[in-house]
């Protein structure tokens, strides 16, 4: 099944990409959730015009992403989470928690969908999370999780 992505899908592509997927994946997951639309010649023409406009914006956004990366590189992020006596958290640290902590630490506003936490953070300590600002700009952000 040939589809045009309308949202970024990990492991598949970014908005505007034309992808070939299995029928069930497209019909049962991508189309109902609005992550993709069916490919037609008319839709392809629209996508081509959108890509040209995006290419012009892409150059500007790369510069912006590099500036944000510099700001994040000098940031000390500290998360206060409820924890038991043994240092184990009640729950875990989410990308929303990290985004709010970055903003509270005086950093730029970061979209929670851009933050990738490789392994669940369930105890106090020092961790590193990856922030994907741009396809060419990734930032490793050290965070300190402190029990309250």
Curated annotation (Swiss-Prot):
GO CC, alphabetical: ribonucleoprotein complex; ribosome
Coiled-coil boundaries: none
Keyword Cytoplasm: no
Superkingdom assignment: Bacteria
Record-linked InterPro entries: Ribosomal_bL9, Ribosomal_bL9/RNase_H1_N, Ribosomal_bL9_bac/chp, Ribosomal_bL9_C, Ribosomal_bL9_C_sf, Ribosomal_bL9_N, Ribosomal_bL9_N_sf
Entry function: Binds to the 23S rRNA.
UniProt family annotation: Belongs to the bacterial ribosomal protein bL9 family.
Name of the protein described by the UniProt record: Large ribosomal subunit protein bL9
Species in which this protein is naturally found: Thermobifida fusca (strain YX)
Lineage: Bacteria, Bacillati, Actinomycetota, Actinomycetes, Streptosporangiales
